[in-house]
Amino acid sequence: MLNGWGRGDLRSGLCLWICGFLAFFKGSRGCVSEEQLFHTLFAHYNRFIRPVENVSDPVTVHFELAITQLANVDEVNQIMETNLWLRHVWKDYRLCWDPTEYDGIETLRVPADNIWKPDIVLYNNAVGDFQVEGKTKALLKYDGVITWTPPAIFKSSCPMDITFFPFDHQNCSLKFGSWTYDKAEIDLLIIGSKVDMNDFWENSEWEIVDASGYKHDIKYNCCEEIYTDITYSFYIRRLPMFYTINLIIPCLFISFLTVLVFYLPSDCGEKVTLCISVLLSLTVFLLVITETIPSTSLVIPLVGEYLLFTMIFVTLSIVVTVFVLNIHYRTPATHTMPKWVKTMFLQVFPSILMMRRPLDKTKEMDGVKDPKTHTKRPAKVKFTHRKEPKLLKECRHCHKSSEIAPGKRLSQQPAQWVTENSEHPPDVEDVIDSVQFIAENMKSHNETKEVEDDWKYMAMVVDRVFLWVFIIVCVFGTVGLFLQPLLGNTGAS
């Protein structure tokens, strides 16, 4: 049994060894065939000669562009950086073979430096090499069709239109063409009308809206020949979320703080300080913007227009605030309020703005209580009523005809009247003179206080007027500025 089992195992091992040897022999033969094919194709091959049988015939090169990443858009230097795959397809009649003669080999991967290839370059390259490096291999088919798809990183020049920054759209182009061969020697044909974006990685700041390719035949001033190029136009749109959150919204809040200046009471003494603080904040934002946008004097970006508008807005608020404070601290000794000013700012504008002075209610209440003593000085009426009993108490020895009738103002009973109609000792006369002096001082003080209150109320009315004016200008100015990109893009589309 053991002897029989050993013979069967030996037969199985021998069969496996024979199969492996045959497979190895076949693979070795295939490698030999590929090596022989490669040697046969490139034994007398000249990579500097165009692959055409007739010198007058052009080499037809099919070209296609595939984008994998929009790496960066540099607005300051006006450069667009892209990761691309450049697909070239052409036919070389010198590199054809019969697959049946080489064990069915239909394709070869050959180094790109060993074959003739079109010198396609990026015309508007800004940094780096203009031509694609030939370090990658090309796919060669048995019928002579060569497909070469080298990857490349290009930094192309792109004129930036920052009028609507950060809600802007840019149109950047990539112009490819042969640098030395004209149309009679190389004829470029575009594969498809769009850029291949199947392997594209989305960019966090820019969105590719459209990427179309066009073929152009151009005659340059330097030469008589016509040159063919293929230009791809990338229509990209900026995603404004970053700038909206970190730049525009803070600017909006700061600009609306300017409106609160006119709601701040003049007595607090911080109105001008608030205005200057807002102006300094906007200046800092303006310095930040100048580092992110290209230096150009052709246009002013939208954010720059808004900051300029807001800075003018804040500057005017400082001027108005100084004017309001000047009105607020005026006195009868320095200024006299004209009648038309009193009419406009103490009667007309308050009624339009639905403002009502608390002093008016006090006057109405005093007038209802005592119509006979209704005057513009309720405080002095109270003073007279408070002082009259004391005066009568001091003058009890005076003649009855000289008594001061209760309920009448002291200002209507001057000391001269008392002196002429009564007899009293000198000490009582001194008391009456003192009371008259105090009453006159109180009257002058009340008149001064009333004029000062009128100036303060006028300052309050001016503040309220400019509060509404600045609210309207701020809202409509902001909406008008930020509607420009929408209207501009609608018109362009």
Curated annotation (Swiss-Prot):
Residue intervals on the Extracellular side: 31-240
List, alphabetically, the InterPro entries matched: Neur_chan_lig-bd, Neur_chan_lig-bd_sf, Neur_channel, Neuro-gated_channel_TM_sf, Neuro_actylchol_rec, Neurotrans-gated_channel_TM, Neurotransmitter_ion_chnl_CS, Nicotinic_acetylcholine_rcpt
| Modes of activity regulation | Activated by a myriad of ligands such as acetylcholine, cytisine and nicotine. CHRNA6 nAChR activity is inhibited by the antagonists alpha-conotoxin MII and PIA, a small disulfide-constrained peptides from cone snails.
Q: In which tissues is it expressed?
A: Predominantly expressed in only a few brain areas, including dopaminergic neurons, norepirephrine neurons and cells of the visual system.
Does this entry carry the keyword Transcription regulation?
no
Q: Which residues are glycosylated?
A: N54, N171
Residue stretches spanning the membrane:
241-265, 272-290, 306-327, 465-484
Alphabetized UniProt keyword annotations: Cell membrane, Disulfide bond, Glycoprotein, Ion channel, Ion transport, Ligand-gated ion channel, Membrane, Phosphoprotein, Receptor, Signal, Synapse, Transmembrane, Transmembrane helix, Transport
Its family remark reads:
Belongs to the ligand-gated ion channel (TC 1.A.9) family. Acetylcholine receptor (TC 1.A.9.1) subfamily. Alpha-6/CHRNA6 sub-subfamily.
The identity of this protein, by name, is Neuronal acetylcholine receptor subunit alpha-6
Which gene holds the coding sequence for this protein?
A: Chrna6
